[in-house]
Amino acid sequence: DINLQEVDLTNKKGNIMILNFWASWCIPCKREMPSLEKLAKNSPEIKVYAINMEKPNKLRTRDFYKSIGITSLDIYFDPEFKLVKQFKMRGLPTSILIDKNGKEFARVVGEIDFYSEDFQDFIKKYY
């Protein structure tokens, strides 16, 4: 999390989770963030983890969020790349969707509009 405390995702079962891996230098990451925030605000049944893949820096990340109009997404880091290794990630942005039982059910490598009708229709199948 923002304080570099480990977050146990196994304790989050029961909710759909989106693990969104991003970096401030990644243009597609910047473009998709507003729709990710909108999804997080309007879909309480989905827990969103926006994970900054850069060197952990709370102030810089807050400034980045502010520069693109993000006001309510929590900040997470993966400084030891544990999640990157666990999910065998390649490239940014990457979004991993996890069902209520803790199993990955989809992965998007590249930019996505999280609030599009197509995405909404898809993810509702897993509520």
Predicted features and spans:
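Short active-site neighborhood of thiol/selenol oxidoreductases, capturing the structured segment around
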Residues: D8-K30
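Thiol/disulfide oxidoreductase modules built on the thioredoxin-like
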Residues: K66-S72, D78-I123
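Structural microenvironment flanking redox-active thiols in thiol-disulfide oxidoreductases
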Residues: K30-I68, P79-Q86
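Generic structural signal for well-ordered beta-strand positions
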Residues: V7-D8, F105
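Conserved Rossmann-like nucleotide-cofactor binding loop
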Residues: S24, P56, K103
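Hydrophobic beta-strand anchors of alpha/beta hydrolase catalytic cores
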Residues: I18-L19, V48, S95
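A generic structural signal for alpha->beta connector loops
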Residues: N15, E45-I46, S72
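Short, ordered coil/turn segments that flank beta-strands lining enzyme active or ligand-binding pockets
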Residues: D1-N3, K12, K100
